[in-house]
A protein has these predicted regions:
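Histidine-rich, glycine-flanked metal-binding segment
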Residues: 1-38
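Short coil/turn connectors at secondary-structure junctions
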Residues: 25-27, 33, 98-101, 128-133, ...
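Hydrophobic faces of well-ordered beta-strands that scaffold small-molecule active sites
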Residues: 40-44, 103-105, 131-138, 162-166
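Hydrophobic alpha-helical hairpins/lids featuring a short glycine-rich hinge
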Residues: 44, 69-114
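Active-site gating loops and adjacent loop-to-helix segments of metal-dependent hydrolytic enzymes
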Residues: 52-84, 160-163, 184
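Active-site mouth loops of central-metabolism enzymes
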Residues: 70-86, 136-147, 168-175
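Histidine/acidic residue-rich metal-binding segments in metalloenzymes
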Residues: 115-127, 145-184
Length: 184
């Protein structure tokens, strides 16, 4: 609404929204006249495991999804837990500075080590008081087209993934695409 109002915050949460709330003695008052209060924003689709890797190992010169996936396949062999956590933390800092408080990240689980999943699960726990992170087990190489893809998806869920995704258009056949959706 365009009407001026007050917001009483207690223990970091909105307790009351009403006009002319009187502050108790000793309570901090912040004059936000002329500003707007908004809830935290939501980043509904990001790949924090590959955040801040543009140009490493090479640039996606065609700009296509398929070349981007090929670049990522070359990059992910160099992953370490610390590398994933560092880059993801830096990306989250930038998101938080712009009002994002809830992040859904897709994590490539077509990696036999599941190192990115492990790193992001740790980071989710470390940042739990600062940002809400939802982790999607995402089979970048395909559930059926990638060796042991189904098993890797199941392992990611056992590790703590919040939900699963799929990439049916990347599977080798239409039938695999349909089956991958049924599996997910």
């Amino acid at each position: 609404s365009a009407e001026k109002t007050d917001i009483l915050i207690k223990d970091g949460k909105f307790e009351k929204i009403a006009p002319n709330i009187l502050a108790a003695e000793g309570e901090e008052v912040i004059d936000c006249d002329g500003t707007m209060a908004l809830p935290q924003f939501i980043e509904s689709h990001v790949h924090l495991d590959s955040a801040l890797t543009a140009g490493d190992p090479r640039w996606n010169l065609s700009g296509t999804l398929f070349e981007g996936i090929a670049c990522w396949s070359e990059r992910k062999v160099k992953l370490s837990k610390n590398d994933v956590k560092y880059r993801a933390r830096e990306a989250i800092k930038k998101q938080a500075a712009n009002g994002i408080g809830h992040v859904r990240t897709h994590v490539d689980v077509t990696d036999p080590t599941l190192i990115a999943m492990e790193g992001l699960l740790e980071l989710k726990d470390e940042l739990r008081d600062e940002v809400n992170i939802q982790i999607v087990a995402f089979p970048q190489g395909g559930i059926l087209s990638y060796p042991n893809g189904m098993e890797l998806m199941e392992n990611a869920v056992k590790m703590g993934a919040d939900c699963v995704g799929a990439i049916p258009h990347f599977e080798f056949t239409r039938e695999y695409g349909v089956e991958s959706l049924n599996f997910a």
